[in-house]
Each structure stands twice: as structure tokens, then as C-alpha cells.
A protein has these predicted regions:
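Positively charged, Gly/Ser-enriched RNA/tRNA-binding surfaces
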Residues: 1-42, 86-253
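Short terminal or interdomain "cap/linker" segment that borders an active site or interface and mediates
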Residues: 46-89
Length: 253
């Protein structure tokens, strides 16, 4: 195993189904930041890198790369920094890109700002608009300083369709703290009813290592209260009691 990766781990997930707007992305990211704050992790200890697969598709199309090759290009470009450039370009060629397109696609990963991306994609880019809307909502949540644009964030799984994101510690010591994005086609692909969706996942291992590295004090454990009832007519009273105790900050089951 490698640092931050175990043979067995717990993953915490949060998903929002049936919301098309980037309000869903903003909400799950705010929930993630809130959770890290609850654990005592300071905001300055990490940054959330945000991109949009739709933007990368727009840019690939502008280079003359046909849409049928985009998924393979995503998988290859996601390996930047993990394997040598020559191997990535070899994968791109296997996916049908010629030498010129391979070089151009790889160079897209050097785009350093949203403004530079917009110059290539054009001012009317729907993907750029989505990113700007997301950043505006993150500002409204008070976590705008946590997020930065990073076109190299692609995510290796093929089901992502739009906004994608990953959070990394600012010292660069660990794997991603959490990651996720939009997957509007996944539910229908696996046989369910079509619905837009956004989700993120936390791995407990990296979060635990980050907390240790920051030497954070143990957080207080909420008092756990278990409420039982013997008859259905007691359900209302039990529910009212549970609501009151939760309002006092207690964990209730």
C-alpha cells in the first residue's frame, strides 16, 4: 500500500440527485468544508481544485479532436504527473489522436487560469459559465477562498460529465482529501431513471493522516442518546424528544 491508501478503508459519500444547476455542486462542497471545519481542519490547510469536463471537451473540439476520442483523452490526461509524458502521448495515439493533436491536448494541461481557458474556449462557453456560477455560489457560502480553477483535475472515472473537483492539502503531502463531480448519465446507464446528479466522497485514511500531521486536538464527542419506545402511540413523543435533544447538540438515535 502507499501513503494515504489502505487495502481496506471507509468512504463517506454525499450525493444530490435531480438538481441540474451548479447549486448542487456548491452545496456538497460547502458540506465538505463544514465537515472538515467540524474536525478542526483549518481552511488554510487545503484547497479545492475545480474544473469542468465539458470545458475540456470544448477545448479538444477546438483543436479538431472528435468527440468520440474525448473519453480516452480524459483518461490519458488524468495521468499527468503520475506517468511520463511519453506514455501519456502513447495512450492518446492509441485513442486515435495524431501527433499534432497529442501535443496540443497535452499542452491544454498547462492552462493556468480560467481567463486563459476562456480565451481558447470563447466568451460564450457554457462550461466557463458553469464554473463562474459555481465560484459565485461558493463566495456566497463564504468558502470562495477555498476553491481554485485547475484544468488538470479530470477524475479518472468515465462517468463524470461536468464539474469535477478534488481537495488537496496545501503542503502536497497526501493524496486527495475528497473528490467528486457531476455524473448526469450514470443512473440511466446502470438501468435507473435518468436524472442529473452530483456527488463527492471522503476517504477516512487521508483525513485521519491530515489531522495527525496538523497535530489537531481531539474534538469533543457529542453525547449519544438512544430513545426507545414500546408502542406506536409513543412515536410522536419520542420524535419530539429526539428533536429537542438534537437541538441541544446531542447525537440521537
Amino acid at each position: 500500500t502507499t501513503k494515504g491508501r489502505k487495502r481496506e478503508h471507509y468512504q463517506l459519500n454525499l450525493d444530490i440527485i435531480a438538481e441540474e444547476s451548479v447549486a448542487a455542486e456548491a452545496e456538497v462542497l460547502f458540506a465538505a468544508v463544514s465537515a472538515l471545519r467540524k474536525m478542526g481542519v483549518p481552511d488554510e490547510a487545503y484547497r479545492i481544485r475545480v474544473s469542468n469536463r465539458a470545458l475540456l471537451s470544448e477545448l479538444l473540439l477546438s483543436l479538431g479532436v472528435k468527440e468520440q476520442f474525448h473519453q480516452g483523452a480524459f483518461i490519458a490526461l488524468d495521468k499527468k504527473g503520475k506517468i511520463p509524458r511519453e506514455q501519456i502521448e502513447a495512450i492518446l495515439r492509441e485513442e486515435g489522436l495524431d501527433d499534432e493533436a497529442c501535443t496540443a491536448a497535452f499542452n491544454l494541461m498547462d492552462i493556468s487560469s480560467l481567463e486563459d481557458a476562456e480565451k481558447l474556449a470563447g466568451e460564450g462557453s457554457p462550461a466557463i459559465k458553469q464554473i463562474r456560477e459555481l465560484f459565485a455560489l461558493l463566495d456566497a457560502y463564504g468558502i470562495g477562498n477555498q476553491a481554485v480553477f485547475d484544468i488538470s483535475v479530470i477524475r479518472g472515472l468515465s462517468y463524470y460529465t461536468g464539474i469535477v473537483f478534488e481537495a488537496f492539502d496545501t503542503k502536497g503531502e497526501f493524496r486527495a482529501i475528497f473528490g467528486g463531480g457531476r455524473y448526469d448519465n450514470l443512473l440511466s446507464t446502470i438501468g435507473g431513471e435518468a436524472a442529473p446528479a452530483v456527488g463527492l466522497g471522503f476517504g477516512d485514511v487521508v483525513v485521519g493522516e491530515l489531522i495527525k500531521a496538523l497535530d489537531l486536538p481531539s474534538t469533543e464527542q457529542n453525547e449519544l442518546v438512544i430513545i426507545g419506545y414500546m408502542a406506536d402511540e409513543q412515536r410522536v413523543a419520542a420524535t419530539q424528544l429526539a428533536a429537542r435533544l438534537r437541538g441541544e447538540g446531542k447525537a440521537v438515535s
